[in-house]
Amino acid sequence: MGNSYKETMNLPKTDFAMRANLPENEPKRLAKWEEEKLYWKVLEKNKDGKPFVLHDGPPYANGPIHIGHAFNKILKDFVIKSHAQRGYYTPYIPGWDCHGQPIEHMVEVTLGPDKMAAIEQPTLRRLCREWAEKYVDVQREGFKRLGVNADWEHPYLTFTPGYEAGNVEIFKKMYLDGAIYRGRKPIHWCKSCHTALAEAEIEYSDETSPSIFVKFKLDSIPGVFEAAGVDGSAYVLIWTTTP
């Protein structure tokens, strides 16, 4: 038998794995973090440090996480972990928005338009709550899989009585401070959902429209055309794409 060329080469000799093997190793690492209660250990280590609190704008609990969720949560995790490594006290309480059109829309898709039109409001609210509860759990596991450190067992949920009561108290304070007033403002309205829409909820699609030039004949006022040196009729020319 010939000599093995492997024995003639200066190959690296280390216990460090040559492959990351992330599909297998990442879940093990995350399980170890959870078993060791890493989030709480970091807080305990930095308990006397200067507080750094990142208020988490909540995602809607209306479906599995997507790349937008990942981008949002990973960037926040970068910021929080970097501050923790510098000695800051960094409690991170995640939350979910459990109200709103995105959740109701998913329930409507599930029921279909006929059942949705006939449903009673208490039943609709119950179904929306159940949908939100389901996807809070689904998204929580997705965020954990991204390696985000947080107090996942005690999130804030906007449909809990305590959270809703807090909103009422803050609204009362805003009213007493003169920040609430009645006025007029144009709003976007969804005729199928029967609800007002925020500007961020409006999606515009590209559309090909005709380009039209139109001339409008001006009514003659005695002496005006003559003074302007116009002999005969005068017109105003317009261009539009929305006939």
Question: Locations of the language-model features?
Answer:
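N-terminal, positively charged nucleic-acid-binding surface of large information/translation enzymes
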Residues: 2-243
